Design a protein with these regions (language model features):
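C-terminal regulatory/interaction module of P-loop NTP-utilizing enzymes
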Residues: 1-117
Length: 117
């Protein structure tokens, strides 16, 4: 999937590589979330990368190590993915809340998990 996203978006450099990896990861996570009946396809990852790239330019984001990077990805996720996921009818949540959970898993929980040891 990452190679498809890179091909379709032209994402390059450190920022492009990181955006592509994160966009593919969060898009895949929409397919595994228990409240989601149908998650997003690779087109969601393409759109997330494109939106995030444009936002990075508008916000003068310097690279993936910029402190504003995680929030930039969340904003891109909301724009690109909120209309692409379909929740289970019994779920008492919103697409935006589901995307926030996925974002927190990727940007808050994963970086702080201890390495296996």
């Amino acid at each position: 999937e990452e190679s498809i996203v890179r091909l379709r978006t032209g994402a390059t450099g450190a920022l492009g590589e990181r955006l592509t990896g994160d966009a593919v990861a969060v898009t895949r996570a929409t397919r595994r979330h228990p409240d989601v009946r149908q998650g997003s396809s690779v087109r969601g990852a393409i759109d997330t990368t494109l939106v995030a790239t444009r936002l990075a330019q508008l916000r003068d984001l310097t690279g993936p190590d910029d402190a504003a990077y995680p929030e930039l990805v969340f904003d891109a996720m909301i724009v690109a993915l909120s209309g692409r996921i379909h929740l289970d009818e019994a779920a008492e949540t919103t697409p935006e809340r589901v995307l926030r959970e996925i974002w927190e898993d990727r940007f808050i929980l994963e970086p702080h998990q201890a390495a296996p040891g």
